[in-house]
Amino acid sequence: MGSLVREWVGFQQFPAATQEKLIEFFGKLKQKDMNSMTVLVLGKGGVGKSSTVNSLIGEQVVRVSPFQAEGLRPVMVSRTMGGFTINIIDTPGLVEAGYVNHQALELIKGFLVNRTIDVLLYVDRLDVYRVDELDKQVVIAITQTFGKEIWCKTLLVLTHAQFSPPDELSYETFSSKRSDSLLKTIRAGSKMRKQEFEDSAIAVVYAENSGRCSKNDKDEKALPNGEAWIPNLVKAITDVATNQRKAIHVDKKMVDGSYSDDKGKKLIPLIIGAQYLIVKMIQGAIRNDIKTSGKPL
């Protein structure tokens, strides 16, 4: 299930200012002996995963339609430029009919076997007003699938970022509240300790994939705060890829579902031993009761 590596034609579609920044970021990766990088994109359906992939590549590499369901299988897009290769893996939505789609996660795991994930983009929408239990269940499912270490290689990407919040809230206040609520959900669902989660330092980046996205004076797609979001996202991706945490290698053990069960398996001998001792103690107590009850008063 390999992907054909093609020359990065879409790179030329970016404004000159964006091209310069991307060349700088990828050059820093090559200086650290990273000649390739693999980015996994996960999230619920309809949050803008595929559109974000298209924006990052600068080409319509993944079909996006508001009137069609998302693809049912993962797709890897690979582009090379100047000796550097970027692989981005688009995936099906992780929710189906209001529940976590575990079948989709199994398909994703199978697709990823023997691959190494340098960065996870966990995608959601900025223009949503609340976080619910389903969001937590999605995080739990991702954690059970890849281990909580995956969150140490994660960026939270909030799409539809050219959003006008309610009149009483500034853009900065709303985006901060929205990102904070999602980060709290990730911490709760991943079951990471407070210090452990703070050390993981999940960064939040914003994206606007619409063709109506505003542009700055350098012709770059810009958010309401003036930020050129594509180079900002790529910089954040390269920062995570080089953050000293181990990349996530998906091996057969993880695919077979034994990853999250290892600790439980190690405890089985201890549990059996404890059960044996308890049974022996109960049997001894019963024998003593029988002996005691058999004595004359």
Curated annotation (Swiss-Prot):
By what name is this protein known?
A: Translocase of chloroplast 33, chloroplastic
Superkingdom field: Eukaryota
- State the Pfam families in the record: AIG1 (PF04548)
AIG1-type G domain boundaries? 34-258
User: Which residues are recorded as binding GTP?
Assistant: 46-51, 65-70, 160, 208-209
PTM annotation (Phosphoserine): residues: 181
Xref: InterPro entries? G_AIG1 (IPR006703), GIMA/IAN/Toc (IPR045058), P-loop_NTPase (IPR027417), Toc34 (IPR005688)
Q: What happens when the gene is disrupted?
A: Plants exhibits a pale yellowish phenotype.
Q: What is the lineage of its organism?
A: Eukaryota, Viridiplantae, Streptophyta, Embryophyta, Tracheophyta
This entry's comment on induction and repression of expression is: Up-regulated by CIA2 in leaves. Induced in light but repressed in darkness.
SUPFAM superfamilies under this entry? P-loop containing nucleoside triphosphate hydrolases (SSF52540)
Which parts of the chain span the membrane according to its record? 37-53
In the record's cofactor note, how is the cofactor described as bound?
Answer: Binds 1 Mg(2+) ion by subunit.
Q: In which tissues is it expressed?
A: Mostly expressed in seedlings and flowers, and, to a lower extent, in roots, stems, and leaves.
Q: Spell out the subunit comment.
A: Homodimer, heterodimer with TOC34 and TOC159, and monomer. The homodimerization and the dimerization with TOC159 require the binding of GTP on Arg-130, and a hypothetical coGAP factor. The dimeric form has a higher GTPase activity than the monomeric form. Part of the TOC core complex that includes 1 protein for the specific recognition of transit peptides surrounded by a ring composed of four proteins forming translocation channels, and four to five GTP-binding proteins providing energy. This core complex can interact with components of the TIC complex to form a larger import complex.
The Swiss-Prot or TrEMBL record lists the needed cofactor(s) as: Mg(2+)
